[in-house]
């Protein structure tokens, strides 16, 4: 029942034509079918907090028998403009040229005479519809931006905790302004949009909550980092995997221990289901592993920067070395050749955690240079996250690309706080991050990043540090979303170019009237050829990253030969190595098989699928257990 356990924005799209931009007239809508549902509701407060959830819940009992009339009944319209779902109420806003109308679901339909007016309206709506979430997230999210060891930003937000940042933390996060400026004119344009968006938030706060401190750039940077930590990262579990391997070798011997380890991690697997055609080799396992470290079994001890923090609010390493990240996003796309309508179809089910109020909310945006509708969130200054433009739609699933590596630091000078790097004994830094519920938060750092724990190698103590490729660059993700929102995306190739801008790791999907496409993003490091990507890297300086995967090297593709592009957080392409924390992602039995199985079952005699067929496949697959369908029969 994964689909029900988390927030789901379901997008149903089929396109008939190409859009020609016109000044700021009512937006031309080229969709044949465009419907969505956001179960957590628009405002997260009564009476509209459960309206959509009740609608969507009624879909589940239908299993594989969803009809066109069911789609109309249980999903609301995602058409552009105010043509459906009335009656509408008009808000009073202190901004000339901006109109906000709410439909019966509370969804705001924005009409603005200027681009900046649309961005301002998005800020006003964020403060109005997610005020509690904004206040709870703005400071707690900072632990994600600084990679505070053992702390989960989303856990602190959901647990209503109180992190108060130090000036050191504020200064560190503020450096993301430099990252935007270094990105050239596009980065500077994002920065301008952030400032306009902040004006909208703060105008609402001034009018309705004057005691609340104004929102700042750092707040936007921090909530972007929260999104990155929660959904846009992968890897960083090498210490636990390494000590697990150490245990296997101790128990089974080197040859058998390595064999079991490699069988379990399934770094690559030519029998695993994939989403696109072609091969994209990344992060191979070398035969020479001289740059890797295997620590002693059960020797890894994570640092605890906040010993008084409850376990459920932290991100401390589990005692289970095989525990995966919990992800549940799926996407089903059908090419025009396989579609009964002759146009591509998409059903997207991105899962972003079920909270009240939800992390995302909906906007229908109509301003010069901004014509979109769909899910957005506090990190996005007037930009689309998941949804549609006039003639395309987009959704995503977490890719969990390997953007985090752990390093084994050789200690020196008889100290736990001195380490060897490029032949010199260095002293670790100290990062005083602030306080959590009044208790100080402080951690050590090396040239690679925060010290996350200690372990032993053949009885000798080492420090374990963590390096994230997107550190200090979380906000660059917004360049992708800006392009989705401002008309820059005009086809698969421009979509690939846009998606390549984000350092966060996602599978991003695209559909228009002719094509379906996918691009897997992330600032993916190229490792030294002597480093096993699933193990700790020696931190002495000889085995550092050699650069990052090129845009062309990222998995991407369009219109697969099978006629179906399906993903449920599985590997997208052959040869693409799974991150060290993603054991089983490349397994031959995957839950995505439930979706393809139902799609194949629902095909008509001529091999075609309509929208009801695709929704039925999604609904049925989400209510089945992959083990019962594929594995248990083999044991009978």
What are these regions (language model features)?
Residues 236-311, 472-503, 509, 565, ...:
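Ordered core of a single globular domain
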Residues 9-17:
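Bacterial N-terminal signal peptides
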Residues 26-345, 350-353, 368-370:
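Substrate-recognition/specificity elements adjacent to catalytic centers across diverse enzyme folds
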Residues 1-9:
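Bacterial N-terminal signal peptides that target proteins for export
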Residues 367-381, 387-392, 396-539:
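Glycine- and hydrophobic-rich flexible loops that cap the catalytic core of alpha/beta enzyme folds
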Residues 20-25:
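Sec/Tat signal peptide C-region and signal peptidase I cleavage site
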């Amino acid at each position: 029942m994964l689909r029900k356990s988390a927030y789901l924005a379901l997008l149903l799209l089929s396109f008939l034509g190409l859009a020609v931009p016109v000044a700021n007239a009512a937006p031309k809508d080229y969709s044949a079918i465009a419907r969505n549902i956001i179960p957590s509701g628009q405002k997260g407060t009564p009476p509209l907090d459960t309206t959509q959830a009740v609608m969507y819940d009624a879909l589940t009992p239908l299993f594989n028998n969803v009809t066109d009339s069911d789609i109309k009944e249980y999903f609301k319209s995602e058409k552009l403009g105010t043509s459906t779902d009335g009656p509408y109420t008009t808000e009073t806003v202190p901004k000339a040229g901006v109109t906000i109308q709410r439909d019966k679901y509370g969804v705001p339909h924005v009409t603005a005479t200027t681009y900046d007016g649309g961005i301002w309206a998005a800020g006003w709506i964020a403060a109005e519809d997610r005020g509690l979430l904004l206040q709870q997230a703005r400071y707690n999210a900072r632990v994600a931006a600084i990679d505070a060891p053992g702390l989960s930003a989303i856990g602190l937000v959901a647990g209503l905790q109180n992190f108060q940042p130090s000036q050191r933390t504020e200064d560190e996060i503020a450096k993301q302004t430099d990252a935007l400026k270094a990105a050239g004119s596009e980065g500077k344009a994002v920065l301008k949009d952030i400032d306009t968006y902040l004006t909208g938030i703060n105008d609402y706060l001034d009018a309705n909550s004057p005691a609340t401190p104004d929102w700042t750039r750092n707040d936007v940077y921090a909530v972007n980092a929260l999104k990155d930590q929660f959904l846009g990262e992968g890897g960083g579990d090498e210490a636990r995997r390494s000590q697990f391997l150490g245990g296997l070798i101790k128990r089974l011997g080197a040859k058998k221990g390595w064999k079991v380890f490699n069988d379990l991690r399934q770094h690559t697997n030519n029998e695993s289901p994939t989403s696109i055609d072609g091969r994209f080799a990344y992060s191979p396992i070398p035969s020479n592993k001289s740059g890797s470290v295997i620590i002693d079994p059960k020797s890894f001890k994570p640092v605890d920067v906040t010993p008084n923090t409850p376990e459920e609010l932290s991100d401390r390493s589990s005692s289970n070395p095989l525990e995966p990240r919990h992800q549940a996003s799926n996407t089903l796309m059908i090419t025009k050749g396989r579609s009964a309508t002759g146009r591509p179809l998409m059903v997207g089910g991105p899962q972003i955690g079920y909270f009240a109020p939800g992390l995302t909310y909906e906007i229908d945006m109509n301003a010069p240079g901004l014509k979109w509708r769909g899910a957005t969130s506090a990190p996005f200054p007037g930009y689309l996250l998941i949804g549609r433009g006039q003639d395309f739609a987009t959704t995503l699933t977490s890719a969990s690309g390997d953007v985090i590596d752990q390093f084994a630091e050789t200690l020196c000078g008889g100290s736990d706080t001195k380490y060897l790097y490029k032949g010199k004994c260095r002293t670790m830094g100290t990062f005083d991050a602030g306080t959590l519920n009044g208790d100080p938060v402080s951690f050590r750092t090396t040239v690679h990043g925060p010290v996350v724990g200690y372990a032993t190698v053949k009885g000798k103590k080492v420090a374990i540090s963590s390096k994230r490729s997107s550190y200090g660059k979380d906000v660059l993700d917004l360049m992708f979303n800006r392009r989705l929102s401002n008309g820059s995306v005009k086809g698969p190739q421009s979509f690939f170019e846009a998606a390549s801008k984000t350092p966060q790791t996602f599978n991003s999907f695209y559909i228009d009237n002719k094509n379906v496409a996918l691009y897997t993003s992330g600032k993916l490091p190229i490792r030294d050829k002597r480093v096993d990507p699933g193990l700790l890297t020696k931190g002495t300086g000889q085995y550092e990253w050699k650069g990052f995967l090129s845009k062309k090297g990222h998995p991407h593709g369009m219109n697969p030969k099978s006629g179906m592009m399906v993903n449920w957080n599985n590997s997208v392409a052959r040869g693409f190595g799974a991150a060290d924390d993603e054991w089983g992602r490349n397994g031959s039995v995957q839950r995505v098989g439930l979706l393809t199985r139902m799609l194949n079952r629902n095909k008509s005699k001529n091999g075609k699928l309509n929208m009801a067929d695709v929704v039925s496949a999604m609904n049925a697959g989400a209510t089945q257990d992959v083990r019962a369908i594929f594995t248990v029969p083999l044991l009978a």
